[in-house]
Amino acid sequence: MSSIIERADFDLIAGWVQPGERVLDLGCGDGSLLKRLIEERGAKGYGVELEEAGVLAAIAKDINVIQGNLEQGLAGFDDQTFNHVVLSRTLQTVRHTERILAEMLRVGREAVVSFPNFAYWKNRLAVMGGRMPVSEDLPYEWFDTPNLRFFTLLDFESLCAKMNLVIRERQVLDEAGRLVTEEPNFLGSLAVYRLGR
């Protein structure tokens, strides 16, 4: 049986999905989140993944997945097809940020986005020490990272305001996966948002 990756943001996302809802996971990797949503929530899950290894791993988990590049949009999906469109730890890797967020809310009633917070105090400390941060949420060295963008909670919320997106809920986690309520832009390592129009 294929292993399922456990992540704290998956716990939050799973809590937001109601039984039987339709979920599209963009950049689904090996399909671990979708597998969990299908098994625990009875969701109808579909994935889009660029990397062949991820597609094959998702197929091995019996996930409905297509190989595709998010940068080319979601033209293959009709408007409002899904209850939730998830972009988990992937937004920082896309070039056309505004377009993908708009597409998510075209094909889904709600967008769920998680990303590493570059303003987390340990990341700031690394940069102040003259080094790019490497952590569980930012696991790559500067020379091999797929990340194109390094942004903070405040940056993301400014973008949401510019795009007239409604932040329905925001949860921020520390490196241990615990909820952060005080000074989240400073103490939070990973942010998870529910967005609507």
Label every model-predicted segment.
Residues 27-29:
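Class I SAM-dependent methyltransferase "Motif I" SAM/SAH-binding loop
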Residues 98-103, 110-197:
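S-adenosyl-L-methionine-dependent methyltransferase catalytic module, highlighting the catalytic core
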Residues 75-84:
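A short acidic, Gly/Pro-enriched loop at the edge of an enzyme's catalytic core
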Residues 31-35:
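Glycine-rich SAM-binding Motif I of class I
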Residues 4-20:
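Conserved alpha-helix/loop element of class I SAM-dependent methyltransferases that forms part
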Residues 36-73:
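Class I SAM-dependent methyltransferase SAM/SAH-binding core
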Residues 84-95:
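A short SAM/SAH-binding and catalytic strip from SAM-dependent methyltransferases
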